[in-house]
Regions:
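Transmembrane beta-strands of outer-membrane beta-barrel proteins
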Residues: 50-52, 80-85, 110-116, 206-210, ...
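Outer-membrane beta-barrel transmembrane domain signature
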Residues: 352-364, 369-404
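Outer-membrane beta-barrel initiation region
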Residues: 26-128, 149-154, 161-165, 174-177, ...
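Cleavable N-terminal export/targeting peptides
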Residues: 1-38
Length: 438
């Protein structure tokens, strides 16, 4: 492969992630940073940015994908952005994506709206559900299931989401719902929004979220075409008590969530999940000679489906296998395929060591200057988790799955872009995404 071709691939993939990252993040990330404005030290006001460019990259499911992405941020409102893309591929897959975030309501300045719209027709989709004739006596997606027990075929995956976020008038948001951060070479140089004391009234940002969602996924299997449709509402209470939510170095995050599909309109079935998540960040001692920043990041997440019931040997009132209690993919258990494990309940643990070295050669590379890379970060991580047919601490902590890996992360255009590689007993997973996993 020529050097010019490699440059185009890296440039295109990075651009695609920066364009679609905020929307793609909703597929699995449960805590997004509060509304904010990030500037460099000495910068007087935010500078609107617009981008438009072709992109290309290669994956197992899309083969060669190509398209055009465009959008901008800071034009209508300093903290808001809107981006979109069209995509085609060499295996006849195609898609349209449109995302927007941090749009402040005109008559209620503490309410922000995000949206995420997508239509996609894909030549290859994989779902870990029952129906594989080679595994008639097993439950697909279970903790003890075979890695080959899945269904694969062409089909559509379409979704629409609207997230409403109310920022409470206390803590770091007592005067304004939008925090401003100033960075020096990508490291926080202004006053942190939290992290030193755990007190929602004086530190950090507390947010109440309501997310309305709709998703339809089909799978063409010969003459059969199973269709799974879901729609509903998710309510979350989040306390983000970190110093800099985009790249935390100290503090903590807590989240409680309740999701309900009421069975309205064309929903396949009703279901309810409840979940809790907590993250903690520690700045490790450093001499400043080798590292700009060294952080230990810890995360725990658990979820249950109280509506779940078994009727005539079939599991009813459960979320689709790609939502709810699932492990595997971009965010949790990165050594396994997307949605590899799914059941009634799940638990997950992760530890990451994130290091930003003093040495930073990337700004000297001319074809990377467009991305305004402030730093690169090296990450080592380990994960453990399990799904189960009941929420029981004993069962959830027995025969747990595990993986470990390394990552390379960049701060490009004031956003964190990551490439993670993880190893598990079932193989190696490689994931590119915007934002830390937690």
């Amino acid at each position: 492969m020529s050097q010019d071709c490699m440059r185009c691939m890296v440039w295109g993939l990075t651009f695609f992630l920066l364009i679609l990252g905020p929307g793609l993040a909703w597929a699995g990330r449960t805590v997004n940073p509060p509304p904010s404005i990030v500037m460099d030290v000495g910068q007087e006001k935010p500078v609107p940015q617009a981008m438009a460019a072709p992109y290309a990259f290669k994956t197992d499911t899309l083969d060669w994908a190509y398209g055009v992405a465009a959008g901008g941020s800071g034009y209508i409102q300093d903290q808001a952005g809107i981006f979109g893309a069209v995509m085609g591929s060499s295996n006849s897959s195609k898609g349209i994506y449109l995302v927007g975030w941090n749009i402040q309501m005109p008559f209620w300045r503490r309410v922000f709206v995000d949206y995420n719209l997508s239509w996609g027709d894909y030549a290859k989709q994989r779902i870990y559900i029952d129906g594989n004739p080679g595994y008639t006596n097993e439950t697909a997606g279970g903790n003890d299931s075979n890695s080959s027990d899945f269904l694969e075929g062409s089909g559509e995956d379409n979704w629409a989401e609207a997230r409403f976020r109310y920022v409470f008038p206390w803590g770091a948001a007592s005067e304004s719902p939008i925090n401003r951060y100033r960075l020096k070479k990508g490291i926080l140089a202004s006053k942190p929004s939290g992290g030193k004391a755990w007190n929602p009234l004086t530190s950090g940002v507390t947010i109440l979220e309501a997310r309305a969602f709709w998703r339809e996924r089909t799978l063409q299997l010969g003459e059969a075409q199973p269709i799974n449709k879901t729609n509903g509402l998710e309510l979350s209470l989040i306390y983000n008590n970190t110093d800099f939510p985009t790249n935390p170095s100290q503090g903590s995050i807590q989240r409680l969530g309740l999701t309900r599909d009421f069975g309205l309109w064309d929903s396949s079935q009703t279901w309810t999940t409840v979940e809790a998540e907590a993250s903690k960040f520690f700045t490790l001692r450093q001499d400043g000679k080798w590292f700009k920043q060294s952080v230990l990041a810890l995360n725990v997440w658990t979820i249950d489906t109280p509506s779940w019931e078994e009727v005539d040997g079939l599991n009813e009132s459960r979320p689709p296998p790609y939502l709810g209690p699932t492990l595997g993919g971009f965010w949790r258990m990165r050594g396994y395929p997307m949605g590899r494990f799914n059941d009634k309940s799940a638990i997950y643990y992760c530890a990451e060591w994130r290091v930003i070295p003093q040495w930073q050669p990337l700004p000297k590379i001319s074809w990377l200057r467009f991305f305004k890379i402030d730093w690169w970060q090296f990450v080592g991580f380990a994960e453990a988790g399990r799904v189960a047919d009941d929420w029981s601490l004993g069962e959830l902590h027995s025969d747990m799955k595990w993986d470990m890996g390394v990552g390379l992360r960049l701060m490009a255009i004031k956003a964190v872009v990551r490439l993670d590689v993880a190893y598990s007993e079932e193989g190696v997973g490689v994931w590119a995404m915007v934002g830390h996993p937690f």
